[in-house]
Amino acid sequence: MDIMKDKIRQALSELDILATEVQIDQWLDYLKLLEKWNKVYNMTAIKNIDEMLVKHLFDSLAVAKYIKGDSTVDVGTGGGLPGVVLAILYPQHQFTLVDSVGKKIMFLKNVKKSLSLNNINPLNTRIENLEGNFDNIISRAFSSVDTFYELCKHFLTEHNQMLAMKGRDLEERNLESLHLNIEKYSIKVPFLNAERNLIVIRKKL
């Protein structure tokens, strides 16, 4: 476990993120819960906690600096990614975690109780049925950025942003014709030798 903590500290340093030992312990406790539940409920395709460290924890932390304001909705959160990871980092920020799969929301309610994460609100619903105002609408669940935008565009205002976490395949052809500001960032995930990108969508003022 000390080796894993050292790896987290190194990743935090590379990402220029300040975190306490308590937060590091919370991230590890979260991954242990995810690994445990995964054996029964198939929460994520990644089974090994060492691999989760990089592909889940560090991947989520790599977008932390792009989070603005004080409220975020994580669309298709699954096992809580990136929402739970970011909620631990930003305890004053409110995270609404949305998924249509009941067992995943049941897991997140367990995470909330086990880690005393009072700034997460897991909701078992479809995103198109949700209403509310959020500073950030984030997801790493969609294969298509177009689909993400279509399902979540009712949240987008002149004062917030949508963030799509993507691998190499960037599909947003249909967005180019809309009245939107679209910015693409190449994301470096510590210990991961793979292309990661973040697409930020805002309304043009």
UniProtKB/Swiss-Prot annotation:
Provide the E.C. number(s) assigned to this enzyme: 2.1.1.170
Annotated residues for binding of S-adenosyl-L-methionine: G76, L81, I127, E128, R140
Kindly state which reaction or reactions the protein catalyses.
guanosine(527) in 16S rRNA + S-adenosyl-L-methionine = N(7)-methylguanosine(527) in 16S rRNA + S-adenosyl-L-homocysteine
Keywords per UniProt: Cytoplasm, Methyltransferase, rRNA processing, S-adenosyl-L-methionine, Transferase
| Gene Ontology cellular component terms for the protein in this record | cytosol
- Do you know which Gene3D superfamilies this protein is assigned to? Vaccinia Virus protein VP39 (3.40.50.150)
GO molecular-function term, one example from the UniProt record: rRNA (guanine-N7-)-methyltransferase activity
Q: Does the keyword Cytoplasm apply?
A: yes
Subcellular location(s): the record lists:
Cytoplasm
Q: Which domain of life is it from?
A: Bacteria
Report the protein's function.
Specifically methylates the N7 position of guanine in position 527 of 16S rRNA.
Q: Which family does it belong to?
A: Belongs to the methyltransferase superfamily. RNA methyltransferase RsmG family.
The record's listing under HAMAP family reads: 16SrRNA_methyltr_G
What is the protein's name according to its record?
Ribosomal RNA small subunit methyltransferase G
Q: Which organism is it from?
A: Francisella tularensis subsp. tularensis (strain WY96-3418)
